[in-house]
Curated annotation (Swiss-Prot):
Family statement: Belongs to the UPF0179 family.
Region entry Disordered, spans: 142-167
Source species of the chain: Pyrobaculum aerophilum (strain ATCC 51768 / DSM 7523 / JCM 9630 / CIP 104966 / NBRC 100827 / IM2)
Domain of life according to the entry: Archaea
Chain intervals with Low complexity compositional bias: 145-157
Pfam family, one: UPF0179
InterPro entries the record matches: UPF0179
Protein name: UPF0179 protein PAE0681
């Protein structure tokens, strides 16, 4: 998956450490380190540290703690999808069909976002419907038109090469 260089606290700078960004504090947005720190991460997403780089002595404006450059990759989200959309490798539009069910990832994924299912890990029944418990990645933001068309790729991508998903 996509790798990004960002800054984390010295305590978090350990290969294998996982963390989730719940929100970005307002104080961060005025910091000179924001573009290489929180500015590279998305709220609601989980990340895993895959490489630690040498510290350059940067300090956090909020905690005054030492910040260390690391390479992170987005960790998959675990959530519910209707059984008819739960196929490994498929890209679908998240429609919040599981709203109100425990395990529904609506706090992490917005209606209309494209997600790529990477693994099916189980099944769950909620509100009279069957859902698959899946691991997935968010691959694109919701379309500006607010379209709720569910799409799966059945043929070659028409997207320009720079916008195609990499396997």
């Amino acid at each position: 998956m996509r790798r990004v260089v960002t800054l984390v606290s010295k305590e978090q700078a350990e290969v294998g450490h996982r963390f989730r960004v719940f929100s970005i504090p307002e104080e961060c947005k005025d910091c000179r380190l924001y573009p290489v720190c929180m500015g590279r991460l998305a709220p609601g997403r989980s990340y895993k540290v895959v490489e630690v780089r040498p510290s350059m002595g940067q300090r956090c404006k909020i905690t005054d703690g030492e910040m260390v450059p690391v390479v992170v990759e987005e960790a998959p989200v675990i959530g519910l999808l209707p059984l008819n959309k739960a196929l490994e490798g498929v890209v679908v539009t998240f429609e919040e069909e599981c709203a109100g069910c425990e395990g529904c990832p609506s706090d992490v994924v917005k209606k209309g976002e494209k997600i790529k299912v990477v693994k099916i890990v189980g099944r769950k029944r909620c509100r009279g419907r069957e859902f698959a418990i899946v691991e997935f990645y968010v691959v694109s933001p919701p379309s500006p038109s607010g379209s709720s068309i569910s799409a799966t790729s059945q043929g070659p991508s028409r997207a320009p090469p720079s916008r195609r998903l990499l396997k």
